[in-house]
Amino acid sequence: MSGWYEISQAKDGQYRFVLKAGNGEIILTSELYKAKASAENGIASVQKNSSDDARYERLVAKNDKPYFNLKAANHQVIGTSQFYASEQSRDKGIESVKNNGTTATVKDLTG
């Protein structure tokens, strides 16, 4: 099964999306958006940019845990990964976003 996006609304009324792999694991999380349409535009940006390796910023957090950001052509962060135990597992996470990011399936959980 291929991955999908989920749009949800936080208690403060803001929206975010996540990209899930086929196994249901969250592989990318967006920032918070004031408007649902902005979150939908963020999904479109992931769909457009996820297959381009140059759009991935490979980082290491202060706690020495590797993670990555996916950036748009304008260098704005579209989504951020979880923290990984190793650079190898982070790189597998990037491959998962590349494989699942182009999916057109969006589950709207905002009710």
Curated annotation (Swiss-Prot):
This is UPF0339 protein ACIAD0721. Keywords: Repeat. InterPro entries: DUF1508, UPF0339_domain, YegP-like_sf. The keyword Repeat applies. Gene3D superfamilies: 2.30.29.80. Belongs to the UPF0339 family. Duplicated subfamily. SUPFAM superfamilies: YegP-like (SSF160113). It comes from the Bacteria. Residues 89-111 are annotated as: Disordered. Sequence repeats lie at residues 10-58, 61-109. PANTHER family: PTHR40606, UPF0339 PROTEIN YEGP (PTHR40606:SF1). It holds the Pfam family DUF1508.
